[in-house]
Amino acid sequence: MNYGTVKFFNDSKGFGFVKDNESGKDYFVHVTGLIDKIKENDEVTFEIKEGNKGPNAVNVKLA
């Protein structure tokens, strides 16, 4: 499990980015990968899953 911070999330478009606290990497997150509703600067936990265009944050929930 990874811990991070929501950098950006657009509710109307259904996607955003989460920054991993340990590695500093940004991961794409799609609305289908959410467990909880998120907004910018929320602290979250997530898993990383390989997607069509690289790694994505999935099972994203508030920490």
Please name every model-derived segment.
Residues M1-F8:
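Structural detector for short beta-strands of small beta-barrel domains
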Residues Y3, D26-F28, E43:
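Well-ordered beta-strand positions in beta-sheet-rich domains
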Residues N10, E22, E50-N52:
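A generic beta-sheet turn/junction motif
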Residues K25-D36:
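Beta-strand/loop nucleic-acid-binding surfaces
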Residues L34-T45:
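Short nucleic-acid-contacting surface segments enriched for D/E, G, S/T with interspersed K/R
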Residues K49-A63:
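OB-fold/S1-family single-stranded nucleic acid-binding modules
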